[in-house]
């Protein structure tokens, strides 16, 4: 039985999506942090492939797993979710519910009514306006400021609706965690959230052993039939527009004219056929891995020579943290969130996106310039890689993340 003196932390999770995105990595690391604190943990997992609700204990942690809903996300079925909490979770001043998915204002409100003594914590892993606006927070501010005019635009109307829901969530909960300074500024300057409610806690990652000798790296490459003289440029993540995939492919087409010994590895869900056909002429130089489990992806971090993160928007990217942990020299955009993680000529080469349009040749040209700098200088590659590793150790270790959440929980 849990101690009456300990806080009871209920971490809400979604089984299917957590196996494929950064929220799953975050929850894994958060649970590691909480295990090192004087708290009791309950991992609440929705949409599990099983026929009934199950409650068990594992490794000193309580687990409540809930089967899949007939349709929609678990937060769309908030009435059922609330019944589950009323059945299995007694209200208490020591309870802290940690929400990681959005938008779910109805669920938060219903839980506030059924469990008025319990605290609520909302960790922002995504702001829904960032994808359609390609991370342009200045445009968001203009849309919100000119609300009446913006409502006449279909896309802007949808954005305002999601902003309203996110704002409602922030107002309902007791604390909001943002992962980057950029999100903190949006919450304070555009959403107008009380700063005392906001906690800036960047993601952290447990330190792992990584292959750092050329001999070990080459042995791993042999298993994947990659020549030791070939320079591997690694992109990891969803192959979508807001992740900057088209800018990378266009840049790689240009790079091949100067560098014949390079390979682009795309570790993520496969591109549609009509997109692949546009880049058929470079297909022998591009490796598509499909979605990879973390264990397999780590091998590519070890084999790669350069990491590229061309996203228009991120929320403290775990791909970025993992690349830094492995000491990769990184080329990144100055997109929303990324500009808080990386400093140009420090732990990465940061390239400006420029205008956020579908055919932005300037962005691709900037990527070409940055990648050329690294490919042309082993010294620069080593320097950026060392700085990346130092940045990980200083800012993104599990210890720093644990201290942030301990500070937050102590404030309750």
Regions found by a protein language model. Name each.
Residues 205, 236, 249, 263-276:
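Glycosyltransferase donor-sugar binding loop
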Residues 144-176:
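Membrane-proximal helix-turn-helix segments that form the acceptor-binding/catalytic region
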Residues 312:
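Aromatic "clamp/platform" in nucleotide-sugar-dependent glycosyltransferases that forms part
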Residues 182, 204:
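Carbohydrate-associated surface elements
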Residues 177, 227-243, 249-252:
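Conserved donor-binding/catalytic core segment of Leloir-type glycosyltransferases
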Residues 329-332, 339-342:
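Short hydrophobic beta-strand element within catalytic cores of glycosyltransferases
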Residues 275-298:
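Nucleotide-activated donor-binding/catalytic signature segment of Leloir-type glycosyltransferases, i.e.
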Residues 211-226:
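A short helix/loop element that forms part of the nucleotide-sugar donor recognition site in Leloir-type
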């Amino acid at each position: 039985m849990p101690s009456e003196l300990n806080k009871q932390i209920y971490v809400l999770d979604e089984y299917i999506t957590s196996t494929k995105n950064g929220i799953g990595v975050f929850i894994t690391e958060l649970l590691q942090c909480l295990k090192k604190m004087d708290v009791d943990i309950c991992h609440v997992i929705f949409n599990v492939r099983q026929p009934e609700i199950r409650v068990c204990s594992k490794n000193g942690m309580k687990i409540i797993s809930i089967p899949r809903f007939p349709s929609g996300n678990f937060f769309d079925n908030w009435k059922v979710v609330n019944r589950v909490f009323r059945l299995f979770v007694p209200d208490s001043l020591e309870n802290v519910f940690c929400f990681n998915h959005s938008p779910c204002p109805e669920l938060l409100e219903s839980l506030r009514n059924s469990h008025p003594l319990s605290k609520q914590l909302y960790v922002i892993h995504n702001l829904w306006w960032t994808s359609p606006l390609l991370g342009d927070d200045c445009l968001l501010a203009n849309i919100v400021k000119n609300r009446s005019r913006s409502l006449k635009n279909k896309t802007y109307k949808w954005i305002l609706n999601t902003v309203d829901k996110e704002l409602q969530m922030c107002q309902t909960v007791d604390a909001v965690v943002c992962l980057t300074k950029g999100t903190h500024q949006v919450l304070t300057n555009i959403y107008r959230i009380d700063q005392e409610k906001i906690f800036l806690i960047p993601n952290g990652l447990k330190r792992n052993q990584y292959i750092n000798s050329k001999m070990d790296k080459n042995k791993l490459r042999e298993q994947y039939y990659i020549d030791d003289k070939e320079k591997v440029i690694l992109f990891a993540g969803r192959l979508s527009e807001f992740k900057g995939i088209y800018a990378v492919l266009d840049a790689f087409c240009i790079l091949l004219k100067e560098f014949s010994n390079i390979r682009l590895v795309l570790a993520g869900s496969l591109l549609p056929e009509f997109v692949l056909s546009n880049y058929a002429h470079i297909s022998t130089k591009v490796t598509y891995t499909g979605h990879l489990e973390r264990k397999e992806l780590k091998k590519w971090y070890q084999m790669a020579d350069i990491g590229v993160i061309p996203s228009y928007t991120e929320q403290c990217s775990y791909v970025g943290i993992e690349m830094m942990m492995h000491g990769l020299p990184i080329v990144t955009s100055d997109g929303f969130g990324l500009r808080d993680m990386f400093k140009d000529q420090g732990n990465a080469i940061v390239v400006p996106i420029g205008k956020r349009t579908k055919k932005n040749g300037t962005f691709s040209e900037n990527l070409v310039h940055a990648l050329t700098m690294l490919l042309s200088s082993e010294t620069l590659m080593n320097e950026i890689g060392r700085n990346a590793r130092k940045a990980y150790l200083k800012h993104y270790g599990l210890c720093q993340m644990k201290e942030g959440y301990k500070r937050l929980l102590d404030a309750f």
